[in-house]
From Swiss-Prot:
ATP binds at residues 12, 32-38, 142, 973-978. One of its GO terms (cellular component) is DNA repair complex. The keyword Zinc applies. This is DNA double-strand break repair Rad50 ATPase. Zn(2+) binds at C559, C562. Part of the Rad50/Mre11 complex, which is involved in the early steps of DNA double-strand break (DSB) repair. The complex may facilitate opening of the processed DNA ends to aid in the recruitment of HerA and NurA. Rad50 controls the balance between DNA end bridging and DNA resection via ATP-dependent structural rearrangements of the Rad50/Mre11 complex. Belongs to the SMC family. RAD50 subfamily. Pfam families: SMC_N. Residues 512-611 form the Zinc-hook domain. InterPro entries: P-loop_NTPase, Rad50_ATPase_archaeal, RecF/RecN/SMC_N, Zn_hook_RAD50. Residues 355-402, 452-506, 574-611, 649-678, 749-823, 865-895 form a coiled coil. Homodimer. Forms a heterotetramer composed of two Mre11 subunits and two Rad50 subunits. The lineage of its organism: Archaea, Methanobacteriati, Methanobacteriota, Stenosarchaea group, Methanomicrobia. Binds 1 zinc ion per homodimer.
Length: 1074
């Protein structure tokens, strides 16, 4: 992988920057705080986004202060493809938070991903590492130079395993472990399902469903035969009944047709008689019309002679007479108009006179009424005074009858008496109500007592039934407990046998929980021994090669290069040392193989122990279920016993309560009789007191009414006297009015006399005009009558011709009706012949017999059908049971296969888990070996002092530095510069190991190596070695190495140098190429 271009806006101290990366070594220098590390952080963030931020930083810290938007575009080349990541961020000044607004990944110019999380995942996939692995391998940040050294072994193991993709194997092993647990759970569930299915199969088979089904099918077959026979009989009866129905219907239709024909003949005869009558009527009408025609002709001749019309045409005659009548009518209208004016004037005068007369008459009538009213008022006053006297005498008599002497004190005495009687009546009413209330309460209490007795009887029955039911359930539960205890003992015996087998394998019961740990430990030991075995075999092969070469040299006698004798030389000593080392390694290898064989035996025993432990676990589960079931049954027994005791106590209390209620009921009956007597006496006394009170109140009311009536009559007398006075004043006014009306009446009469004379003259003129108009109107009427007679004569002639045609039509109709009567009489005769020999009653009797037989057969069919339905229902239930049995057997077979399958899956998962453990251990051993070789090689290359011999990296990733004298040291005890060298060497060794993983000693797939201030703790000599280390990394294929440093030697040796500066006024950084 190579970085190509970085474009940033508003990131840290950079306002805007477009930076191009070159191949080779690039050194970025500048003063402290100028923005060198910010440039590297921008590259890091361009790759992994906001995931690079630690918990002490937020995204807003990466954005230039005061800016609202920011952008990072990072272009890079990886495995032959060009990639570009565009990221944009938005800052909110209100919330003071920043968020990602855009994240797009392009490959060869094509948009492939447009989302932050997916882009992050794609970059992880491309580089085979996340941001943490990137920091631990390629990007050595400032201040994190000794992170790997100071990390705990577990953390260091995790970091390096993640880089080498070994963490995946551990993840797969954990998944396999989870799968084993799930399979074990499924296996247990399958076993429980097997038990349930077997129990259900046994329950169905115990009912012998096949035998019962055959018997029911035979019965159903017999029932079908009976039904078939009954249906045939029913069909025969229905067919016979249908035939009779048809014959009866045909008989009835013929009778009905005969009646219809007779009725038609009767109607035809009536129509014929009607035709004769109509013909006679038409003939008479023709004769009458001819007579009328003759009379009209004679009348017309007489009219012409009388009126002098002569032989004029009727139209000319009518026109002449209409003109004369119109002239006479106009004269009459003119005279009538003048007469109407005079009449109107006369009417007005007469009306005025009438009104005066009416007014005068009204005044006289009013005068008379006033005089009459005065007399009547005087008579009323006398009557009122007579009524007052009678009422006073009646009141006096009532008071004397009641024993009151004076009228003045009688009202007070009556009031006192009424009050006394009211108090007495109230007391008696209270006594009556009290007695009624007590009686009602007693009756209600008696009713409640009876209801309680009924409820107690029901409760007694329910309690007894509950006691019996509880006893039955206790017996069933105790039986179940005994069976449960027996099953527990059987399972415990089986468990004891399994424990004995487990003990024979050398495992105690308390060690079962640690079997998984033992298994993992043994597998790790096996893997470790396997790794040592392979390492010793490789070393032995190398020693054997060396020994063989030395022997060949010894056989030659001289060194082939310098020609020196080999006896006694250093090569001879080395050969002896190799022989000794070979014997040692062979012995160690044999010991390891023995240990390996023992481990295999232990693993085999452990597998057997695991199987036994699984059986023990299953037994424990079954025992636990049975114990829980027994506990539940025990609780139910205790519950039932407690309920039985409660019900027994309840029975006793109910019996006691029943006796109390019966005693209370008898006492209540006695009390009710006494209260009924008391209530009757109180009611009688109250009625008598109430009667006396009513009489006294009636007397008081009557006296009060008489007094009020007297007062009313005195008021009326006063009113009448006032009316008499008013009537006197009215009489004077009316007399004055009558005098004025008499004067007006005389003037009106004189005016009317003059109008009467003028009216007589106008009426005379009108009579003469009317007479002339009447004569002309009479002549016009005679002319119109002559015209009407002529028209009538034409109509009569036309009518006579129509009547003669109708007479001819009626004669033809009579002939047609005679033919119809003959045809229908013949049809009646034919139908009568067909009906002979068939009697309706006989047919109906036969039909009733067949209908009764059909109903009886239908009832038999219904009973047989119900019987068949019941059989079919039972057959269906049995077939369902057999179907369920087949399904259960299939399910049983499937469950058995599933159990075998799950056992195989569990075994495979266990084997797979062991394989993952073994592979991980093997790969870790190989990686540790390779990493150790690379680490020591680079440490020897980098470290200029000779104080340390080598570095050891054990299987647990513990790092140990050895001095020349063999003394081990912890890396954290080294000096700062030594730790820096050690960290650089370790990072470069990991980088080289990863390069080997990408295919040979090439780093094409790895990101550029970035070193941020690597020379902080290094002296001049080690800085020169750092330059050599950088050259070595270039030689193994690292295409880009980016270093941030102030050191001149690094700057001088770099391929590309850039200077970073910051403007102190704007606080913005910029970069220039040197």
């Amino acid at each position: 992988m190579k970085l190509k271009n970085l474009y940033i806006e508003n990131i840290r101290s950079y306002r805007k920057l477009d930076f191009t990366f070159e191949d080779g070594v690039t050194v970025i220098s500048g003063v402290n705080g100028s923005g060198k590390s910010s440039l590297l952080e921008a590259c890091f963030m361009g790759l992994f986004g906001s995931k690079i931020l630690s918990k002490d930083f937020v995204l807003a810290d990466m954005i230039f202060k005061g800016a609202e938007t920011a952008k990072i575009n990072l272009g890079f080349e990886h495995l032959g493809k060009e990639y570009l990541i565009e990221q944009a961020f938005r800052y909110s000044s209100k919330s003071e938070n920043a968020s990602s607004s855009k994240c797009v990944l392009y490959a060869d110019g094509e948009n492939i991903i447009d989302q932050a999380t997916r882009t992050y995942e794609e970059v992880r996939t491309l580089l085979n590492m996340d941001e943490e692995a990137y920091r631990n391998c390629a990007y050595i940040r400032q201040g994190e130079i000794d992170v790997l050294i100071n990390a705990k072994p577990k953390d260091r193991q995790r970091m390096i395993d993640d880089l080498l993709q070994l963490g995946k194997l551990e993840e797969y092993r954990e998944r396999t472990g989870y799968a084993k647990t799930a399979v074990r759970r499924l296996e247990r569930d399958t076993k429980n399902s097997l038990v349930g299915v077997k129990a259900e199969i046994e329950g169905i088979e115990s009912t012998e469903p096949v035998k019962a089904l055959n018997g029911l099918k035979q019965k159903a077959k017999e029932t079908d035969g009976s039904l078939k026979e009954l249906n045939e009989k029913k069909d025969y009866a229905a067919a016979r009944k249908g035939e009779l129905d048809l014959r009866i219907a045909e008989y009835r239709e013929r009778l009905q047709e005969i009646e219809v024909l007779k009725e038609a003949i009767r109607k035809t005869q009536e129509d014929k008689a009607g035709c004769f009558k109509e013909k006679e009527a038409f003939s008479g009408e023709v004769q009458g019309q001819r007579r009328i025609l003759l009379e009209l002709g004679e009348e017309n001749t007489g009219l012409r002679d009388d009126c002098g019309f002569g032989d004029l045409e009727i139209e000319a005659l009518l026109l002449h007479q209409e003109k004369e009548e119109s002239s006479a009518r106009e004269k009459v209208n003119a005279v009538s108009k003048d007469l109407a004016l005079l009449l109107k004037e006369g009417e007005t005068g007469s009306q005025a006179l009438c009104e005066l007369e009416k007014e005068k008459t009204q005044a006289e009538r009013t005068l008379l009424e006033c005089r009459t009213s005065i007399g009547a008022a005087n008579k009323e006053i006398e009557g009122y005074r007579e009524n007052i006297r009678k009422l006073e005498e009646e009141s006096k008599g009532l008071r004397e009858k009641a024993g009151f002497k004076a009228a003045s004190g009688a009202a007070d005495e009556i009031a006192l008496l009424i009050k006394e009687f009211e108090e007495k009546e109230s007391l008696l009413r209270d006594r009556k109500n009290e007695a009624s209330t007590k009686l009602g309460l007693s009756l209600k209490e008696k009713e409640t007592c009876d209801l309680n007795l009924v409820e107690l009887e029901k409760e007694l029955q329910n309690a007894g039934a509950a006691v019996r039911k509880g006893s039955t359930e206790i017996e069933a539960l105790e039986k179940e407990l005994r069976e449960n205890s027996k099953a527990v003992l059987d399972i415990q015996e089986q468990k004891s046998e399994v424990l004995a087998e487990l003990k024979g394998l050398g495992f105690a019961a308390d060690q079962l929980e640690n079997l998984e740990d033992f298994s993992e430990l043994l597998l790790e030991n096996k893997s470790r021994l396997h790794g040592k075995e392979k390492e010793l075999e490789a070393t032995l092969r190398e020693l054997e090669n060396n020994i063989r070469k030395n022997r060949e040299l010894f056989a030659a006698g001289k060194c082939p290069t310098c020609g020196q004798e080999l006896k006694g030389s250093e090569i001879a000593c080395t050969a002896e040392e190799c022989e000794d080392k070979k014997e040692k390694l062979a012995s160690e290898l044999a010991d390891i193989k023995v240990q390996h064989a023992e481990l295999e035996k232990k693993i085999t025993r452990l597998k057997d122990a695991k199987k036994l432990e699984k059986r023990i676990s299953d037994y424990d589960i079954e025992i636990e279920k049975l114990q829980e079931k027994a506990k539940a049954s025990g609780k139910l027994i205790e519950t039932h016993r407690a309920r039985i005791e409660e019900d027994a106590l309840k029975l006793e209390s109910l019996d006691k309560r029943k006796q109390e209620l019966e005693t209370s009921g008898r006492q209540l009956l006695s009390d009710i009789k006494t209260l009924q007597v008391q209530e009757a006496e109180a009611r009688k006394a109250h009625i008598e007191g109430e009667k006396t009170l009513i009489e006294v109140k009636t007397l008081d009311r009557k006296l009060a009414e008489n007094t009020a009536e007297i007062e009313s009559l005195n008021g009326k007398i006063r009113t009448s006297l006032a009316l008499i006075e008013n009537y006197g004043e009215r009489l004077g006014e009316l007399n004055d009015k009558l005098k004025a009306l008499a004067e007006k009446e005389n003037l009106s009469k004189e005016k009317l006399k003059a109008l009467e004379l003028a009216l007589e003259a106008a009426q005379k003129k009108e009579n003469e005009a009317k007479k002339a108009h009447s004569e002309s109107e009479k002549l016009l009427g005679q002319a119109k009558k002559l015209q009407a007679n002529l028209l009538s004569m034409e109509n009569i002639k036309h009518k006579i011709s129509e009547l003669e045609a109708a007479i001819r039509n009626l004669a033809e109709k009579v002939g047609f009706l005679d033919r119809e009567i003959l045809e229908r009489s013949e049809r009646i005769r034919q139908l009568g012949e067909k009906l002979e020999g068939n009697r309706l009653s006989e047919l109906q009797q036969k039909r009733a017999q067949f209908e009764q037989a059909q109903a009886k057969i239908t009832e038999n069919i219904r009973e047989k059908t119900e019987e068949k339905d019941s059989l079919l229902k039972e057959i269906g239930m049995l077939e369902n049971s057999l179907k369920r049995l087949r399904e259960l057997r299939k399910e049983l077979k499937a469950l058995e296969n599933r159990q075998l399958y799950l056992e195989a899956v569990y075994s495979n998962a266990e084997e797979l888990e062991n394989t993952y453990i073994r592979v991980r251990a093997d790969m870790r051993a190989r990686n540790i070996g390779a990493l150790s070789v690379l680490l020591n090689e680079m440490f020897a290359f980098m470290y200029t002092n000779n104080a340390y011999s080598h570095i050891e990296l054990d299987p647990e990733y513990n790092l140990t530095v050895y001095r020349k004298d063999g003394t081990p040291l912890e890396p954290k005890l080294l000096s700062g510069g030594e730790r820096a060298i050690f960290n650089l060497v370790l990072r470069c060794a990991i980088y080289r190991l990863l390069a080997l993983g990408f295919g040979g000693d090439k780093a094409d797939g790895l990101p550029p190596m970035i070193l941020d201030e690597p020379t902080v703790f290094l002296d001049r000599g080690h800085i020169r070695q750092l330059l050599k280390l950088i050259d070595m990394m270039r030689s193994i294929g690292v295409g880009q190495i980016i270093v941030v440093s102030h050191d001149d030697s690094l700057i001088d040796s770099a391929d590309h140098v850039f200077q970073v500066e910051k403007d102190p006024l704007t606080n913005m950084s910029s970069i220039t190429r040197l």
